[in-house]
Amino acid sequence: RAIDFSMNHLGKHGMPAGLYADWNDCLRLGADGESTFVALQFYYAMTILKEFAAYKKDDDYIKYLDESQEKLGKLIQELCWNEDRFIRGFTENGEVIGKRDDPEANMWLNPQSWAVISGFASDEQADKALQQVYDRLNTEYGAILMDPPYHAHAFEGALAVIYNAGTKENAGIFSQSQGWIILAEALRGHGDRA
Protein backbone atom coordinates (compact mmCIF):
# COMPACT_ATOMS: atom_id res chain seq x y z
CA ARG A 1 0.00 0.00 0.00
CA ALA A 2 2.87 2.41 0.69
CA ILE A 3 4.19 1.96 -2.86
CA ASP A 4 0.72 2.54 -4.28
CA PHE A 5 0.25 5.64 -2.10
CA SER A 6 3.52 7.11 -3.33
CA MET A 7 2.78 6.20 -6.96
CA ASN A 8 -0.56 8.01 -6.62
CA HIS A 9 1.05 11.11 -5.09
CA LEU A 10 3.73 12.21 -7.53
CA GLY A 11 4.99 15.73 -8.08
CA LYS A 12 5.27 17.64 -11.32
CA HIS A 13 8.41 15.80 -12.44
CA GLY A 14 7.09 12.35 -11.53
CA MET A 15 8.98 11.84 -8.27
CA PRO A 16 7.19 11.36 -4.92
CA ALA A 17 5.39 14.56 -3.89
CA GLY A 18 6.57 16.34 -0.77
CA LEU A 19 3.08 16.62 0.72
CA TYR A 20 3.95 18.25 4.07
CA ALA A 21 7.68 17.65 4.60
CA ASP A 22 10.28 14.91 4.36
CA TRP A 23 12.62 13.94 7.22
CA ASN A 24 13.76 17.58 7.45
CA ASP A 25 10.62 19.27 8.72
CA CYS A 26 12.22 22.71 8.23
CA LEU A 27 12.44 22.08 4.49
CA ARG A 28 8.97 22.73 3.09
CA LEU A 29 9.01 22.03 -0.62
CA GLY A 30 5.23 22.29 -0.90
CA ALA A 31 2.54 19.68 -1.43
CA ASP A 32 3.68 19.10 -5.02
CA GLY A 33 7.37 19.69 -4.37
CA GLU A 34 9.74 16.74 -4.69
CA SER A 35 12.53 15.55 -2.42
CA THR A 36 15.50 13.75 -3.96
CA PHE A 37 16.08 12.19 -0.54
CA VAL A 38 12.58 10.66 -0.53
CA ALA A 39 12.85 9.63 -4.19
CA LEU A 40 16.02 7.68 -3.38
CA GLN A 41 14.35 6.02 -0.39
CA PHE A 42 11.41 5.13 -2.62
CA TYR A 43 13.82 3.67 -5.18
CA TYR A 44 15.36 1.52 -2.44
CA ALA A 45 11.95 0.46 -1.13
CA MET A 46 11.15 -0.94 -4.56
CA THR A 47 14.38 -2.97 -4.50
CA ILE A 48 13.42 -4.48 -1.14
CA LEU A 49 9.83 -5.19 -2.17
CA LYS A 50 11.02 -6.99 -5.30
CA GLU A 51 12.78 -9.46 -3.01
CA PHE A 52 9.54 -10.09 -1.13
CA ALA A 53 7.63 -10.43 -4.40
CA ALA A 54 10.21 -12.94 -5.67
CA TYR A 55 9.79 -14.95 -2.47
CA LYS A 56 6.02 -14.99 -3.11
CA LYS A 57 6.62 -15.75 -6.82
CA ASP A 58 4.52 -12.69 -7.74
CA ASP A 59 5.88 -12.07 -11.24
CA ASP A 60 3.26 -9.43 -12.05
CA TYR A 61 4.25 -7.32 -9.04
CA ILE A 62 7.94 -7.76 -9.83
CA LYS A 63 7.27 -6.47 -13.35
CA TYR A 64 5.32 -3.50 -11.97
CA LEU A 65 8.13 -2.66 -9.54
CA ASP A 66 10.82 -3.10 -12.22
CA GLU A 67 9.02 -0.72 -14.58
CA SER A 68 8.27 1.81 -11.84
CA GLN A 69 11.82 1.73 -10.50
CA GLU A 70 13.33 2.11 -13.97
CA LYS A 71 11.12 5.13 -14.66
CA LEU A 72 11.95 6.71 -11.30
CA GLY A 73 15.65 6.00 -11.79
CA LYS A 74 15.68 7.80 -15.13
CA LEU A 75 14.00 10.82 -13.55
CA ILE A 76 16.45 10.95 -10.66
CA GLN A 77 19.40 10.63 -13.04
CA GLU A 78 18.14 13.30 -15.44
CA LEU A 79 16.83 15.78 -12.88
CA CYS A 80 18.81 15.35 -9.69
CA TRP A 81 22.46 14.65 -10.53
CA ASN A 82 24.37 17.95 -10.68
CA GLU A 83 28.00 17.25 -11.72
CA ASP A 84 29.32 16.11 -8.33
CA ARG A 85 26.24 15.91 -6.12
CA PHE A 86 22.57 15.08 -6.00
CA ILE A 87 20.36 18.14 -5.50
CA ARG A 88 18.02 18.33 -2.50
CA GLY A 89 14.84 18.61 -4.54
CA PHE A 90 12.28 20.89 -6.17
CA THR A 91 9.77 23.29 -4.67
CA GLU A 92 6.23 23.01 -5.95
CA ASN A 93 6.98 26.20 -7.92
CA GLY A 94 9.80 24.41 -9.74
CA GLU A 95 12.75 26.02 -7.92
CA VAL A 96 15.74 23.68 -7.69
CA ILE A 97 17.15 23.34 -4.16
CA GLY A 98 20.76 22.35 -3.64
CA LYS A 99 22.27 22.96 -7.06
CA ARG A 100 25.99 23.74 -7.34
CA ASP A 101 25.56 27.44 -8.08
CA ASP A 102 23.11 28.21 -5.27
CA PRO A 103 24.69 30.90 -3.05
CA GLU A 104 23.55 29.02 0.07
CA ALA A 105 22.71 25.41 0.89
CA ASN A 106 24.22 24.10 -2.34
CA MET A 107 25.48 20.85 -0.79
CA TRP A 108 23.16 18.58 1.22
CA LEU A 109 24.07 15.49 3.21
CA ASN A 110 21.05 13.19 3.01
CA PRO A 111 20.68 12.89 -0.78
CA GLN A 112 24.34 11.90 -1.06
CA SER A 113 24.03 9.24 1.66
CA TRP A 114 20.84 7.78 0.24
CA ALA A 115 22.12 7.76 -3.34
CA VAL A 116 24.69 5.25 -2.09
CA ILE A 117 22.51 3.35 0.41
CA SER A 118 19.79 2.86 -2.20
CA GLY A 119 22.24 1.43 -4.70
CA PHE A 120 21.16 4.10 -7.18
CA ALA A 121 24.41 6.03 -7.64
CA SER A 122 27.00 4.75 -10.08
CA ASP A 123 30.45 4.13 -8.63
CA GLU A 124 31.65 7.43 -10.09
CA GLN A 125 28.66 9.36 -8.75
CA ALA A 126 28.97 7.76 -5.32
CA ASP A 127 32.66 8.60 -5.05
CA LYS A 128 32.19 12.19 -6.27
CA ALA A 129 29.24 12.84 -3.96
CA LEU A 130 30.89 11.30 -0.91
CA GLN A 131 34.07 13.25 -1.58
CA GLN A 132 32.01 16.45 -1.55
CA VAL A 133 30.44 15.36 1.75
CA TYR A 134 33.85 14.62 3.23
CA ASP A 135 35.41 17.87 2.00
CA ARG A 136 32.51 20.20 2.77
CA LEU A 137 30.28 18.70 5.43
CA ASN A 138 32.57 16.63 7.64
CA THR A 139 33.56 18.03 11.06
CA GLU A 140 35.25 16.49 14.08
CA TYR A 141 31.75 16.03 15.58
CA GLY A 142 30.01 14.57 12.52
CA ALA A 143 28.65 15.73 9.18
CA ILE A 144 26.52 18.87 9.01
CA LEU A 145 23.21 18.77 7.10
CA MET A 146 24.17 21.25 4.39
CA ASP A 147 26.64 23.93 3.40
CA PRO A 148 26.73 26.88 3.34
CA PRO A 149 23.99 27.58 5.90
CA TYR A 150 20.98 29.71 5.00
CA HIS A 151 21.39 33.38 5.78
CA ALA A 152 20.01 35.67 3.09
CA HIS A 153 19.04 33.51 0.11
CA ALA A 154 16.58 31.06 1.64
CA PHE A 155 13.53 30.15 -0.41
CA GLU A 156 10.07 30.58 1.13
CA GLY A 157 9.94 27.03 2.49
CA ALA A 158 13.41 27.08 4.05
CA LEU A 159 12.29 27.39 7.65
CA ALA A 160 15.83 26.53 8.79
CA VAL A 161 16.79 30.17 8.16
CA ILE A 162 15.23 31.06 11.53
CA TYR A 163 18.09 29.23 13.26
CA ASN A 164 21.62 30.53 13.59
CA ALA A 165 24.08 29.10 11.09
CA GLY A 166 25.39 25.76 12.30
CA THR A 167 22.44 25.01 14.56
CA LYS A 168 19.50 22.68 14.19
CA GLU A 169 18.32 22.31 10.57
CA ASN A 170 20.49 25.22 9.41
CA ALA A 171 23.68 23.20 8.94
CA GLY A 172 23.55 21.51 12.33
CA ILE A 173 24.55 17.92 13.09
CA PHE A 174 21.79 15.32 13.53
CA SER A 175 22.29 11.82 14.90
CA GLN A 176 20.03 10.12 12.31
CA SER A 177 21.95 11.49 9.37
CA GLN A 178 25.25 10.36 10.94
CA GLY A 179 24.12 6.75 10.73
CA TRP A 180 23.23 7.20 7.08
CA ILE A 181 26.56 8.74 6.08
CA ILE A 182 28.47 6.11 8.08
CA LEU A 183 26.57 3.38 6.22
CA ALA A 184 27.15 5.05 2.85
CA GLU A 185 30.88 5.41 3.45
CA ALA A 186 31.11 1.81 4.66
CA LEU A 187 29.24 0.54 1.60
CA ARG A 188 31.85 2.28 -0.58
CA GLY A 189 34.69 0.69 1.39
CA HIS A 190 35.69 3.90 3.15
CA GLY A 191 36.09 2.40 6.61
CA ASP A 192 38.51 5.10 7.69
CA ARG A 193 35.94 7.81 6.90
CA ALA A 194 32.95 5.90 8.22
Labelled PLM ranges:
Residues 1-21, 28-41, 45-56, 64:
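Mature extracytoplasmic enzyme cores
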Residues 1-14, 35-43, 126, 171-194:
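Aromatic-rich carbohydrate-recognition surfaces in CAZymes
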Residues 13-17, 84-85, 114, 193:
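Beta-sheet entry/capping signal
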Residues 15-18, 86, 146, 163:
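Short clusters of hydrophobic/aromatic residues that line enzyme substrate/ligand-binding pockets
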Residues 20-24, 91-93:
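Short linear capping/connector segments at secondary-structure termini
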Residues 26-39, 94-118, 160-178, 183, ...:
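Solvent-exposed loop and edge beta-strand segments that line ligand/cofactor-binding
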Residues 41-158:
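Catalytic cores of carbohydrate-active enzymes
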